[in-house]
Each structure stands twice: as structure tokens, then as C-alpha cells.
């Protein structure tokens, strides 16, 4: 078993089973799939995003392998990617809790909790009206250059973001 807890979870979950505690978190559900749940919650007055993985089964593992993709077995890959991005200076979210238990890769239970990035707007939402209301070329070129810089740093660091879309790039609005 692996368990890493930073505040406020370290204090709030002391003496408790962290896996039971994470499953009990309530909030706005963003994604609910078989074996995986993503939600936004508030703990100690702060916003967090929670991803819980409950195992994907051998069928999903073999399906991924037969299509030449490595399966996502749990939260560990995201935890390691976030740590690596911080090491090389790529701006990204901050993970504050991670847990993984079970040796069977098809049934592994894991979770990751990240601090909410707020206030932000996704680059996708920011650019929605660009067909009707194009931005200044200088702004558009600056955004393209920054996305290219971040993506290049990510790839040079060995991090492969399997769904690298503009909706995952957030602009701070404050």
C-alpha cells in the first residue's frame, strides 16, 4: 500500500482509513465511469478535485495492450506525472493526497486529490468566440507559443499526456 497525505487531509484523516474517507467525499461529480469517479469537493474551506480509481478489469487491460496502448491502472501515473512536471518547471496542478492499495492491477484501488486551480478559464472556453471575434494576433501568437513551450517541456521530461487538448490548459483570471 502507498499513502501520501498533505494538509488538510493528513490532519483530518489521521487514524482513519484514507480509502474509506476518500470514498465518502461528496461534491459535484464531473465524471462517473465504471471503476472511476472524478469530483470537485470542498474540504476545510478549500476546493479540491478528487479522482478515484477502483480497478479497470482484465478485459480493459487486454483491450489497451492489443491496441498498443499502456492501460491506465490507477492514480499512480497521474501522481508521478505531476511530480515530474513540478521537477522540470512546467506549471501544473498540485497534488495533495495519493493512495494506492492492492497488488492485482485489474482491481487496484487508488486515488489522487489535487488543489483546485481557481479562478481559471480553459483555453478552449477562452477561444470559443474567436471565429466571430478574433483576438489580436499578438495575443493568439503568445498563447500558441506558451502552449508549445509547456508541451515541449512536458515531452522532453518524458511525460506523455494521453489527452492533451486545449481544454486542459487553464488561464488564471485574477
Where are these regions (language model features)?
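AlphaC helix of the protein kinase catalytic domain
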Residues: 122-134
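Active-site mouth loops of central-metabolism enzymes
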Residues: 136-141
